[in-house]
């Protein structure tokens, strides 16, 4: 067997990149562990702001761990796919990292997808669980008999709002929501979280940087959209690269998270890059010129 050959790769572009290092050491753990390590350094910094309501890194980690315990309480196991059909809201951040913490895979999809598209995403990923908003429940219920879902968890935007804003929301947007039958086979977010508070068994999975953590979907411009498997290392490397090429960044800096969490830029940069480096995400659930 011949000895491994050494290759000299020319990198002329480095001369134009100033003080950007030619080599970076990437965080060797999971998505959650990267954020957890950062939170230890900045526990009282604001992790994200949603409709004026601030959440610290300390509080965010607590919410993620309770959510992870809730996922275990409903039977989510390492390697399971959990579909997340949410806009940029606190529940999306919480459940995304909780899924990673229990060793499952987050299948991120557009919450405004059609019923047919949702059915495709659920079947393509083999998802057994789904998390979405109450306003999208009827689309999931319409295709439920065609897929293999064990549980649908329904979150609500109002649950993430401060009291004054919640009152205004219920007078405007809240009135537009279709009623969900009381006997609907779903689990409301608040009840889901209560289960997490009551779960006291092991919930942290032993996963590493190279394990698949996320499924995002291609644009489908040349055919049927395809699921793209991404590891924790993919996101952690991106987070390190973005900061290395933006030396003006400082912990506490804010980013307007307009790009959605089912999009590579939105999830990888607006959310994970900021949260693994002490930044603050301004979560925008629906982009308009006014918002």
Task: For the regions a language model picked out, list residue spans one by one.
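Conserved AMP-binding/adenylation subdomain of ANL enzymes
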Residues: 236-254, 262-291
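Conserved structural elements of the adenylate-forming
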Residues: 63-66, 194-199, 228-250, 258
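Conserved pre-ATP/AMP-binding loop-to-beta segment of ANL
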Residues: 43, 179-217, 224, 247-254
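Structural core segment of the AMP-binding/adenylate-forming
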Residues: 74, 101-191
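Conserved AMP-binding/adenylate-forming core of the ANL superfamily
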Residues: 25-27, 36, 44-89, 93-97, ...
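Conserved AMP-binding A3 loop
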Residues: 56-58, 204, 213-237
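A short helix-loop-beta submotif of the ANL/AMP-binding
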Residues: 68, 81, 87-107, 111-115, ...
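AMP-dependent adenylate-forming
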Residues: 8-16, 33-56, 203
């Amino acid at each position: 067997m011949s000895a491994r050959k050494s290759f000299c790769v020319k990198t002329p572009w480095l001369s134009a990149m100033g003080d950007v290092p030619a080599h970076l050491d990437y965080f060797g753990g999971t998505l959650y562990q990267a954020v957890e390590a950062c939170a230890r350094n900045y526990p009282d910094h604001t992790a994200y702001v949603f409709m004026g309501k601030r959440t610290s890194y300390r509080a965010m980690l607590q919410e993620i761990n309770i959510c992870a315990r809730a996922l275990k309480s409903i039977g989510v196991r390492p390697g399971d796919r959990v579909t997340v059909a949410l806009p940029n809201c606190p529940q999306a951040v919480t459940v995304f990292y909780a899924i990673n913490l229990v060793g499952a895979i987050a299948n991120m999809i557009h919450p405004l997808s059609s019923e047919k598209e949702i059915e495709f995403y659920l079947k393509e990923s083999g998802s057994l669980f789904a998390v979405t908003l109450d306003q999208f429940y009827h689309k999931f219920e319409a295709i439920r008999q065609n897929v293999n879902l064990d549980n649908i968890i329904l979150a609500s935007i109002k649950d993430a709002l401060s009291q004054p804003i919640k009152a205004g929301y219920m007078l405007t947007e809240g009135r537009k929501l279709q009623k969900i039958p009381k006997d609907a086979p779903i689990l409301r977010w608040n009840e889901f979280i209560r289960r997490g508070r009551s779960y006291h068994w092991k919930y942290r999975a032993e996963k590493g940087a190279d394990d698949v953590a996320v499924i995002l979907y291609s644009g489908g411009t040349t055919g049927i959209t395809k699921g793209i498997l991404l590891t924790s290392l993919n996101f952690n490397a991106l987070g390190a690269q973005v900061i290395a090429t933006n030396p003006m960044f400082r912990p506490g800096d804010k980013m307007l998270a307009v790009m959605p969490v089912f999009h590579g830029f939105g999830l990888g940069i607006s959310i994970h890059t900021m949260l693994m480096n002490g930044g603050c995400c301004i979560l925008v659930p629906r982009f308009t010129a006014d918002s």
